[in-house]
Regions:
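Long, ordered, helix-rich scaffold segments
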Residues: 107, 137, 218, 229-231, ...
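Short coil-to-beta strand junction motifs in C2/discoidin
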Residues: 232-238
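Surface-exposed ligand/attachment interfaces on beta-rich extracellular proteins
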Residues: 258-260
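Hydrophobic alpha-helical and helix-loop surface patches within well-folded domains
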Residues: 1-230, 348, 352-353, 359-372, ...
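Solvent-exposed serine/threonine-rich low-complexity stretches and specific carbohydrate-binding patches
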Residues: 252-256
Length: 596
């Protein structure tokens, strides 16, 4: 039971953190607490529910039981992330939040944990400035994924009883990671502390390679790294394997570098890590992958496994282990895909490939893949919501329409303009779920006159959610002079300091903003830091955005700049950003060799 007599929730106008779990008096940004059914989007409604649940979970995980030291930050944040998903899913099962958890939390965590510059979930902290840096996707998302994996391993009933034991024993006190493992292990009657040690105290995660010969499969685990070194050979995880052969499912623990297992049926297809409960990737031999492709095409495999196989395949293209053309051929099996996460993840990959290669001679070929797949989504969903459609359709629809517009679909751009003109006459005429998409596309094909309209709308907007939609539009023009105007506007009083990173991040991913943003950042760095305030965690996002606009040749220049302009608390982010730049440049070079 909640131990205090009251729990207040307070909206704060300018707040760098999204929310703060003060015991009995949780504080939030206005946009993360205040929901208006008439003007708020489906995404906003969902995000508010998740953040409120996250902060309420902290009343137990963080407040009732508090970590002993910062190395166990995950006991607070991983649990709040995990429990928030569980809570919202309980109230709104139709939102398919656990599916979205895979697409958002697991993808984000794996993206960071695949870097050499990542860190373990349980990480040493030696200086106060290092504390801010570990409030990242490892402490939140990877930890949440590992807890989900553990729950599946010990069963949800044992997991719940173990948590109750842990909270009761350590109430109004401090705890460490091993205290949690003792409580859950005692209930589950399994030595989970040894298994969890490899996931909590060891940086990174494994990729499991599998080769099949008849009913025999040979498995090998190595650390998955985007930038491979000798250290990739280090590390052994205790991996809970779930092998699905269609009519039979078996569970195993892989605790060696290499291991062999026997399938129940040498004639049947199989998939490992079914349901993607484990925090690891799979690399199948080519024959197994071909067989799985047929099962994907016919939708014999469930949608999570369809998502998982494509997601793992793409990740190996980025590292150079698989050829991109083979991956693109493989994606043909998904052109009748109708599930949210499976469709969205593939659409994002295809669009990001176009963004990466848009200056190359062969980019039209990749652009066509992205266009065709986005068009199949659009043809299925259309512009307007249908009665009783899935909650996630609104999220997927906006991505597909936005992507098509930016790829030059004239029909989409014309319809966006038509709906925007109606909106100017009657703001209730445009669905909240489509507003940002329409605004962004109108700006994308707009001019100075359009810019003035959005600036006026921004200044007149009453809600922060609406202001942020218009600000997104101001970041979406193609003209350099208009984007520079937006950046200068960001430094002024009309944009709250809590939002300073948003226009920079938006323009960093704008194909036309990439060309000049780094130069602008260098010139205005002191103004940015002054407005944000030294120590503001949002500055890490500004540093990370640099990775979108530079290439590996500029690494020395960037390091020289930050040596002259040091910013305590962003050192780890800078190293991770530089590594991502090297990985991206290497990936582009490998694509050039393959397609030239």
């Amino acid at each position: 039971k909640y131990p205090l007599p009251k729990l207040d929730m307070i909206a704060i106008p300018d707040f760098a953190a999204g929310a703060m779990e003060n015991w009995g008096a949780i504080t939030f940004r206005e946009t993360i607490l205040l929901y208006d059914p008439k003007t708020s989007s489906t995404r906003t409604k969902q995000f508010i529910a998740e953040v409120i649940s996250h902060e309420i979970a902290h009343q137990w995980f963080g407040n009732l039981v508090t970590m002993k030291w910062w190395n166990d930050l995950w006991l607070n944040e991983s649990f709040a992330t995990f429990m928030a998903t569980k809570i919202v899913d309980k109230f709104y099962p139709e939102w398919d939040l656990w599916d979205q958890f895979l697409e958002d939390a697991m993808n984000t965590a794996m993206s960071l944990d695949a870097l050499k510059t990542s860190h373990p979930i349980d990480v040493k902290v030696n200086h106060p400035s290092e504390i801010r840096e570990i409030f990242d996707s490892i402490s939140y998302d990877k930890g949440g994924c590992v807890l989900r994996m553990l729950e599946h391993f010990v069963t949800d009933k044992n997991f719940q009883k173990g948590l109750q034991k842990y909270l009761k024993k350590h109430a109004y006190s401090n705890a460490e990671g091993h205290d949690l493992w003792k409580s859950i292990g005692a209930v589950a009657k399994k030595p989970i502390d040894k298994m969890m040690d490899s996931w909590i105290n060891q940086v990174g995660f494994p990729i499991v390679s599998v080769n099949r010969k008849g009913s025999q499969i040979s498995l090998k685990q190595t650390r998955y790294l985007l930038e491979e070194t000798k250290s990739s050979k280090k590390g052994i995880w205790k991996i809970p394997l779930i092998i699905d052969e269609g009519d039979v499912t078996t569970s195993h623990i892989m605790d060696k570098k290499s291991q062999s297992l026997k399938l129940k049926n040498k004639e049947r297809n199989f998939i490992i890590n079914s349901g993607r409960t484990g925090f690891y990737r799979m690399d199948y031999d080519s024959e197994t992958l071909d067989n799985l492709s047929l099962l994907i095409d016919e939708k014999v495999l469930n949608y999570v496994d369809r998502w998982s196989i494509q997601n793992d395949y793409y990740s190996q293209c980025v590292t150079g282990k698989k050829k991109l053309q083979d991956y693109l051929d493989f994606t043909n099996a998904y052109f009748d895909e109708d599930n949210y996460i499976s469709s969205l993840n593939l659409a994002q990959h295809l669009y990001s490939l176009y963004s990466l290669t848009h200056k190359e001679k062969f980019s039209d070929e990749i652009k066509q893949y992205a266009f065709n797949f986005l068009r199949t989504i659009y043809d299925r969903l259309g512009w307007d919501a249908k009665k009783n459609e899935p909650h996630t359709n609104a999220l997927l629809r906006s991505f597909a329409i936005s992507g098509l517009g930016k790829l030059g679909d004239e029909e989409i751009l014309k319809e966006s303009k038509k709906r925007f003109d109606k909106f100017l006459k009657n703001q209730n005429s445009l669905s909240a779920d489509l507003q940002e998409t329409v605004f962004v596309l109108v700006a994308w094909s707009g001019n100075e006159s359009t810019y003035k309209k959005f600036m006026s709308l921004y200044k007149k907007a009453k809600s922060q959610e609406q202001k942020l939609r218009f600000l997104a539009a101001l970041c979406s023009f193609q003209q350099k002079n208009l984007l520079l105007k937006t950046l200068e506007f960001t430094l002024g009083p009309d944009v709250r300091s809590q939002n300073i990173q948003m226009p920079i991040m938006r323009i960093a991913v704008n194909l036309y903003g990439k060309e000049f943003l780094w130069g602008w950042l260098k010139k205005n760095w002191k103004k940015i830091v002054k407005k944000a305030g030294i120590g503001n965690p949002l500055l890490n996002r500004v540093v990370a955005s640099i990775g979108q606009v530079v290439d590996a040749k500029q690494e020395k220049e960037i390091r020289k700049f930050f040596k002259a302009n040091p910013l305590r608390g962003t050192e780890m982010t800078l190293e991770q950003t530089m590594e991502r730049v090297r990985v991206s440049s290497k990936f582009l070079n490998s694509i050039k060799k393959e397609f030239s």
